[in-house]
Amino acid sequence: MVIAKRLYHRVKVRWPTTLATRQGSVDGITRNISIDGAFLYYNHPDPQALPLRADERVEVVFDVPGDHQIRASARVAWSDILAVEESSTLLGIGLQLIDVSHKDREFLLKTITGKMF
């Protein structure tokens, strides 16, 4: 088994996030982020909901405190069911950020660096 190491340090955040998939749009919370990846979770109203497939392409919008949004295209690195309740399913997703504008990447780098020190 090959274990992939992260290339960049991740920082803990709690940013509202919108994820657009082929099945529609969902709102979630980003829990950690780096310059090239993020972990987020969201509640799906269907208790039978399945996680997204690895390698699926999605669009993501991170609502950063201070009235700033970071938009990116991303690849689902992994996805899993975190919890199932009567009325919903909690899903977790690891994303690889693929296409981020230069301006947003610079903002993200500055934000991450500021949280590290």
Where are each of the predicted segments found?
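Hydrophobic core residues within well-ordered beta-strands of beta-rich domains
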Residues: 13, 26, 58, 70-72, ...
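N-terminal helix initiation/capping motif
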Residues: 1-46, 109-117
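Short conserved beta-strand and strand-loop elements enriched in small hydrophobics
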Residues: 15-20, 51-69
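Short, conserved beta-turn/loop elements at beta-strand boundaries and strand-helix junctions
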Residues: 22-24, 35-36, 79-85, 102
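Short beta-strand-centered aromatic/proline hotspots
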Residues: 27-30, 72-79
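C-terminal output/interaction extensions
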Residues: 13, 84-117
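Short beta-strands and strand-coil junctions in structured, solvent-facing domains, enriched
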Residues: 46-48, 82-83
